[in-house]
Amino acid sequence: MDVFQEGLAMVVQDPLLCDLPIQVTLEEVNSQIALEYGQAMTVRVCKMDGEVMPVVVVQSATVLDLKKAIQRYVQLKQEREGGIQHISWSYVWRTYHLTSAGEKLTEDRKKLRDYGIRNRDEVSFIKKLRQK
C-alpha cells in the first residue's frame, strides 16, 4: 500500500492534478482525468448553510448518480476532517429535494442533461413539503 501511495504522490504533482488533496483516492484521480478530457462535469451542490460542494459526475449521469456522488464526496470529506461519523442518507433524500433553476430533480432515473444541468451548474437542497 505504501508503494501505491508513493506512486500516487508522484502523479498528483502533475500540473493537471495539483489541486487534489494529499490523501487522494484513485477515484478522485480518475474523476479529475475525466474532467480534463471532457468526459465528466462538475456540479456545484449548495448546502443550506452556504457551503458549496464541487461534485464530479460523468456527462451522461442521472439524478441517482449525482446523489451517490454527493454521498461519496461527503464521506471522503468526513474521513479527512473528522466530525459526524454517520449520516442517514435515506433520511436526507426523504426530507430534501435537489433543485436546479427552481426545478425539483424528482426522477432518479432521469439524466441531468434532461433537466438542463451542464458543467459548473448549481444544484441546491430544498426541504420537501409534507403531503397530506
Swiss-Prot record:
State one Pfam family annotation.
Ubiquitin_4
Signal peptide (residue range): none
Domain Ubiquitin-like: start-end pairs: 41-132
Q: List the disulfide bonds.
A: none
Q: InterPro entries, per this entry? A: SNRNP25 (IPR039690), SNRNP25_ubiquitin (IPR040610), Ubiquitin-like_dom (IPR000626), Ubiquitin-like_domsf (IPR029071)
- PROSITE patterns, per the entry: UBIQUITIN_2
Q: Name one GO cellular component term.
A: nucleoplasm
Quick one: a GO biological-process term for this protein? mRNA splicing, via spliceosome
The answer on whether this UniProt entry bears the keyword Nucleus reads: yes
Subcellular compartments: Nucleus
Supply the alphabetized keyword list: mRNA processing, mRNA splicing, Nucleus, Spliceosome
Which SUPFAM superfamilies does the annotation name?
Ubiquitin-like
Domain of life of the organism in this record?
Eukaryota
Task: Relate the assembly described in the record.
Answer: Component of the U11/U12 snRNPs that are part of the U12-type spliceosome.
- What is the designated name of this protein? U11/U12 small nuclear ribonucleoprotein 25 kDa protein
Q: From which organism does this entry originate?
A: Homo sapiens (Human)
Gene designation:
SNRNP25
